[in-house]
Amino acid sequence: MTKKRAVKERLILRNPTEDCIAPKVQKFEMQILQPEHIKTYLDAAEKRGLLPMFYLELVSGLRKGELTALLWSDLDITNRTISVSKQYVKNPNGELTLSRPKTETSVRKVSIPQEAVDLLVAEHKKHPNNPYMFPSPVTGEMYYPDSIVNLHKKILKDAGLPHIRFHDLRHTFATLALQNGMDVKTVSSMLGHYDAGSTLRTYTHATRQKQDEAAQTMGSFMAQVM
């Protein structure tokens, strides 16, 4: 029973939540790793022995908890896919635990390019008996999500690139995929979004560019036939 209904039915005198001030939602401006910076970024990642992990991130847009939770068995070499069925998250006590993604659409298979498969196979040869896709060289266990955020910051610093959040690598994947012709529904399914509408709302800037290009194409066509 809601507090408002309890007041209406005179079970309580007043709604104790009415005077509560909701905390402000912290909003972050979406940024992407600019295309001209991608090679510099990946070169810096390679020097740290982290190229497979961050290359995969840029071609898949996985959430950090999904990326760190990957097992070697999640890679389908033949079909060039990654199975996303778990994530590393903090529970209410602040402890890191493995759990299923929060929505069914987040449980998915993500297609990746052959270059990513080759990098992952080469990475696995370095630790063939370890079940984790990206084990920490220190502990042999999977990385904490916050650990790869810190690694990302170090890569940016090494490369002399401006700061962007690790989550912006996910935005980079989605934006570049849309700008290079991937349809919204496919991008949405790869990101694990609930529906294509949420993808459209998030990446309006990318789809608007494609609309502008389509308009110019139609304009050129009409100029030829008139």
Mark where each language-model region is.
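Basic, Lys/Arg- and aromatic-enriched nucleic-acid-binding interface segment
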Residues: 8, 12-15, 19-72, 77-78, ...
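Catalytic-site neighborhood detector that most strongly recognizes the C-terminal catalytic loop/helix
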Residues: 24, 32, 88-90, 140, ...
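Active-site/catalytic core of tyrosine-dependent DNA strand-transfer enzymes
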Residues: 36, 79, 87, 113-162
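DNA/chromatin major-groove-contacting recognition/catalytic segments
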Residues: 36, 40-46, 93-100, 201, ...
